[in-house]
């Protein structure tokens, strides 16, 4: 299965799950994440503002925004620009209908980067939506622990890869 076919297959599988089921699964996946040694020890974590077909992170962001330095991606042109989340951060709908923070670029270090994806395999390969935003961003941060989070139906036997694809160090799902 090539990347386009895999994206279509995952989209079909997602339709078999109710919004309520995905929200409940998201809570359980994020509970696994917050009990993970890498998350517990991390002071600065890059997360993401979820789209409807991703592990739902909005409540998780609110829960942790005062406990850790939380960084969120914004999309500017072809690049991810990281922004630190603060108690005063305002949000606006950005490209792809993603709720993005409106603040200055974060230029510090990261302890952990949490990455969404359309599909992952158990050895850390991932495909996103096909624009390469995360791969371009992650290639500048190869020394940082990268954890992909996904629903079980997004975890497949093998993800087709290309030379510029950046692997996750680990993938967290319910299974």
Language model: regions and residue ranges:
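N-terminal active-site beta-alpha-beta segment that forms phosphate/nucleotide-binding
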Residues: 1-100, 104-108
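Conserved phosphate- and dinucleotide-binding cores of soluble alpha/beta proteins
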Residues: 81-175
